[in-house]
């Protein structure tokens, strides 16, 4: 990786962390409802989106809600989604980011369906899913 690419990757990680910290403050103030923090997930989210192309799709789970930021989604849209406000709904085609799924792994069939369809139609597109914490983690 070049120095410029490393800087961009770092910028994305900081963007995700700052958003996450602000969203947690809003949650504690009662401005948004439930919010699942994504601390320590920044490198995974930033690295994956950095490796994906613009035409590739992202299917985030609840801890990856800030991931749309690195695709250009306005922060207010994500915050409004957590409030359940209609202005928090987005067209997935605008950023190739599917709606956030809170129940763990419920977005996997959607990603698989899109992957199958694009494989048949295009053949070169990637659909990335994120499972957050808790999915297939050992207990104990």
Question: Residues of each region from the PLM?
Answer:
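Cofactor-binding active-site loop characterized by glycine-rich and histidine/acidic residues
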Residues: 18-140
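Charged, compositionally biased N-terminal leader segments and the immediate start
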Residues: 1-2
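Active-site-adjacent structural elements in enzyme catalytic domains
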Residues: 6
